[in-house]
Amino acid sequence: MKSLVLVKQVPDSNSAFRLNAAGTWVDETNLSYTVNDFDRYALEELLKLKDAGKVEEVVALTVGGADAAAALRTCLATGADRAIHVKDEAIAGSDPFVVARAIHAAIASEGFSLILGGLQADDDNHTQVGGLVAGLLDWPFASAAVALSLVDASTLRVERELENNEVQVVDVTLPAVVTVQTGMNTPRYASLKGIMAAKKKPVATLALSDLRLDLKDVEAKLRTVSLAPPPKGKGAEILTGSPDEVAKALVSRIREKTGVL
């Protein structure tokens, strides 16, 4: 069975963020980047299936500019067998449908049986690419997976996280697309041996012309009008004194603000 993991390079959450001049995205100057956290769990799940002898090949794919190659190198060092980089500045940073369309075109002749990806991206939280890819392929789709297991060669059992901590168990017929939650496993890290081996693993680089797409095919349908930081809260009041004095002052403040107590 051939498998594919969809990965995205996103800004490191520890970076210092500020808006760009247009107020439509963050200023990417001097940001550090990493593999989207949700996608790390998807990769680990496929590597576990490969370790168990149920998957023959794990391929990593990303859509983005030249810098996105770093995410693929991380996946290769962690254990993926090869990678596909859809690299074109016309696609980089586009909307979910355009990204899904590029993925669909890139894998048309690959013959994958299982495609995993993260439930969402840490930077934009669109939660759409996996479902759109499944729709373009006309494959079954399951989202928010917290556990996966192969029932047989053609059936994947998926435990899905629902609201109120409920879990739904569904069987999907392969080939299929599944997006996964964080916390479903413990992602492995690249070893020195893996980092060295990654340098010899193949990375196929595809542009729009290779996908038989042109600029009108990748014209974004979604445009960010504005982006704003969360409103700043009012400064906290620090209560001082003995424990009894602080407790009385706290009760007084609650009574003033809410009318209870």
Q: What positions do the PLM features span?
A:
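N-terminal glycine-rich FAD/FM-binding segment characteristic of electron-transfer flavoproteins
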Residues: 1-261
